Regions:
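Short, hinge-like loop/turn segments at secondary-structure boundaries
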Residues: 130-133, 156-159, 196
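His/Asp/Glu-enriched short active-site or ligand-binding loop at hydrolase and phosphoryl-transfer sites
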Residues: 192-219
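Soluble catalytic domains of enzymes that build or remodel membrane lipids, polysaccharides, and related
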Residues: 158-167, 172, 193-194
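Terminal accessory/targeting
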Residues: 1-85, 103-112
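Alpha-helix N-cap and loop-to-helix initiation/capping positions
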Residues: 152-159, 218
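Active-site beta->alpha N-cap acidic-glycine motif
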Residues: 57-149, 165-169, 176-177
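A short acidic, helix-capping loop that chelates divalent metal ions and anchors anionic groups
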Residues: 145-152, 210-213
């Protein structure tokens, strides 16, 4: 069983962020206490989230220092001493795979987090309800999936995440946790600051399974 979970994690993860089943408070605390890794300061202008990989068995590094990221409640990797894999999925459009993923997760008793955009909420409300019913967490990936680092005012930033929150709560009748993932991994210091001011925790990733090209989908 443990071996299969590791295989599932590598096969289907879009990023390493957190385990929904452990609870929001435990999650955030574990990230705050974890050994975040990085190499550069947070960019003041638009930056694409990037990773560096060292020797096999070591954690990757991000292109921002842990200290700078932590200032804005931003994380991408957990404590390397814990043998834990955090599964996340970015849901923009439904291509028939989400149901299969949910079935696999349920079969092997694995919890995950799904970052959703407005289009997914509008077109697949039943899948969103199923995510919640089966114990997964649903995070915020913005309504229109824009380059959020180009948004200069808090009100416009807030509308992108608030519209997702309102629709999610209308669909599920539950409060949405304030977990945010920047579309395309594009961010700036101002971007992360606005998210924090709105009460959000920002999560990047430490490994990505390249499945976002709609003309080159896995078969």
């Amino acid at each position: 069983m443990k071996k299969w979970k590791r295989i599932l994690a590598v096969a289907v993860m879009l990023a390493l962020v957190f385990c929904a089943g452990r609870g929001s408070a435990v999650l955030v605390k574990s990230w705050q206490n974890g050994g975040l890794l990085g190499v550069n300061a947070v960019a003041s202008t638009t930056e694409n989230w990037g990773l560096g990989f060292g020797e096999s068995g070591t954690q990757p590094t991000g292109n921002a220092t842990p200290e700078e990221l932590r200032k804005y409640n931003t994380y991408f990797i957990g404590n390397g001493d814990d043998k834990v894999i955090y599964l996340t999925f970015d849901c923009g459009y439904e291509n028939g795979n989400t149901e299969k993923i949910l079935e696999a997760l349920k079969k092997h008793d694995v919890k995950a987090t799904f970052f959703v955009v407005g289009h997914f909420l509008e077109t697949s409300p039943d899948l969103v309800r199923k995510m919640v019913e089966e114990g997964h967490t649903v995070g915020n990936h913005t309504y229109h999936h824009p380059d959020m680092s180009e948004i200069a005012d808090v009100s416009s930033f807030q509308k992108e995440v608030e519209d997702v929150k309102l629709l999610y709560e209308e669909i599920t009748d539950k409060e949405m946790v304030k977990y945010y993932r920047p579309p395309q991994g594009k961010y700036s210091e101002s971007n992360l600051k606005m998210a924090k001011e709105l009460g959000y925790y920002t999560f990047f990733w430490s490994l990505a399974y390249v499945d976002w090209y709609d003309t080159d989908q896995p078969t």
